[in-house]
């Protein structure tokens, strides 16, 4: 799609999951795996700036999309304002991008470098201040996305089970991103054999699952603008350079379309040398489910 030698970008370390030697899946609710504290290996990859090529990548085709948003939210710590103002703005943004007949906001998180207590995230039912993750992952499997939407919206359980829906993440910074940018992988090129399921069980009884990502390739970026080749595909990473609060990175977290699974987009944060001494990064991210079959 894009000449691999042309896009601006950076070389950065990307953290992947190291599978169990016996081929067994990660243990259910393995917090150390989820937080990137064990079974991890790092590869240097090329991360390309999406902004000059934003018209060439779409949510439907690649699993992510550049978008602009001019939010009227004035206080990212005010839960009422977030739900009454920001949710409506993001619902409209997602509806404009997808053409969905119905969009429902059901989660938000304000992330900083200081908060990293996964247990607190679970205790407060998906709300709160959360630290950044440092391992490549996909938030839900298609079945995990179905479980979450049915749990959050029980009156829609039959509709989503028999129709089409997708969980979508909208990632927007509160200030210009100066360190730990979000990167996303081109879903059209990601080899499915590199996705490994991990089961999750929440305190409230919800059962879900997400993907951790392995990398089997030997062609990491090194010092050149090269995608990481792995299996029959490649890991092609993108970010928005110096992302502003008026810019959003919209990406899929899995779902179903007419009974066919939609695999979400692998993503993570990364650090590059010029960013190490930059200021703290603040970000607001939200998840949205939309039922394309809803009238």
UniProtKB/Swiss-Prot annotation:
Molecular function terms from GO: oxidoreductase activity
Pathway where it operates: Secondary metabolite biosynthesis; terpenoid biosynthesis
Keywords: Oxidoreductase
EC number(s) stated in the UniProt entry for this protein: 1.-.-.-
Gene induction: Expression is positively regulated by the cluster-specific transcription factor pbcR.
An annotated GO BP: terpenoid biosynthetic process
InterPro entries found in the cross-reference section: AsaB-like
PANTHER family assigned: BLL6449 PROTEIN, OXIDOREDUCTASE AN1597
Family: Belongs to the asaB hydroxylase/desaturase family.
Annotated function: Oxidoreductase; part of the gene cluster that mediates the biosynthesis of the diterpene ent-pimara-8(14),15-diene (PD). Within the cluster, the HMG-CoA reductase AN1593 functions in the mevalonate pathway, which produces isoprenoid precursors. The geranylgeranyl pyrophosphate (GGPP) synthase AN1592 is needed in the formation of GGPP, the precursor for diterpenes. Lastly, the pimaradiene synthase pbcA performs the 2 cyclization steps that convert GGPP to ent-pimara-8(14),15-diene. The putative roles of the remaining cluster enzymes in ent-pimara-8(14),15-diene biosynthesis is unclear.
Official protein name in the record: Oxidoreductase AN1597
